[in-house]
């Protein structure tokens, strides 16, 4: 059996070699326009031409090649037909099937469908024998989509078609890469209220960024202080203060660097300096003139109290002692000077 098969293959190869021989030197004169009375050009010494033209059918010639022809060209300079063969061609179709070609070129035959049948190959509707439920099950089975709805997108495994691509068991309302979080929350928010800004942990959304336990009315980085930053002991509302209390203004009723005192009415006005400036604990109101003198002084204006007399005596004694010490020091200095003069003249 093997020898017979090899013999048949050898015969087929020889036949193919004979039929696929191409003329190397074509007859240019044979294709040229000549008069009808001219003689026919002599035949060439070619076995293939002799075999083809040996019979009476000179008007028709048929050639068979091993490879299919991909391109047919004409060389007008040589008056020849140029054939380009396709070595790795498709498998020959012995019969053209227009339905198969239409199915192959169908738009519904999408690329990268693995294990699924084409829509054209499905049985027509109404051919299912049974109820509507069985018909739907047969349709899904025929689609061969592994128990999934054909409306799902490509490469979706057991997920709801409403979900976006690459979502595994998550709600489609959630954004991409959100794991078990509320879709109202922003990206990368873990257990926080969606009204809060980014990177806010347990704070109300009314507060500004980086505020810890403070009211939103306070400015940035204010810890338990009033609205007016760096104002100590003053009213927190500038708009509610009187114009007399403008900070860092000199020559106004609100005296700068005054502690516990009220503003005088004539502070640095008309070139007059107030006596209470930079004085601590002094009353602004001057002492009222005494309308009634002391009773002890009304009767005897010349008499003094015993305390005044004692103080006067003490001051007098102190002055006398100081005068005596001063006189003694002057006398000692005079004596020393006279002794030095005597010694100088004695020498």
UniProtKB/Swiss-Prot annotation:
Keywords, sorted A to Z: Amidation, Cleavage on pair of basic residues, Neuropeptide, Repeat, Secreted, Signal
Processing and modification events after translation: This precursor includes 13 peptides that have FMRF or related sequences at their C-termini, and other putative neuropeptides.
Polar residues: bias regions: 321-347
Chain residues in the propeptide: 23-102, 235-240, 283-347
Molecular function per GO: neuropeptide receptor binding; receptor ligand activity
UniProt keyword Ligase present: no
GO biological process, one term: negative regulation of heart rate
Cell compartments where the protein resides: Secreted
Domain of life: Eukaryota
PANTHER family named in the record: FMRFAMIDE-RELATED PEPTIDES (PTHR20986:SF22)
Gene coding for it: FMRFa
Family to which the UniProt record says this protein belongs: Belongs to the FARP (FMRFamide related peptide) family.
Residue numbers of Phenylalanine amide PTMs: 114, 157, 168, 179, 190, 201, 212, 223, 232, 250, 259, 280
Keyword Repeat: yes
Modified residues (Serine amide): 270
Basic and acidic residues bias (residue ranges): 305-320
Species this chain originates from: Drosophila melanogaster (Fruit fly)
Function field: In insects, FMRFamide and related peptides have modulatory actions at skeletal neuromuscular junctions, and peptides that are immunologically related to FMRFamide are released into the circulation from neurohemal organs.
Tyrosine amide found at: 146
Pfam families hit by this protein: FARP
Name of this chain's protein: FMRFamide-related peptides
Any GO CC annotation of this UniProt entry: extracellular space
Annotated signal sequence range: 1-22
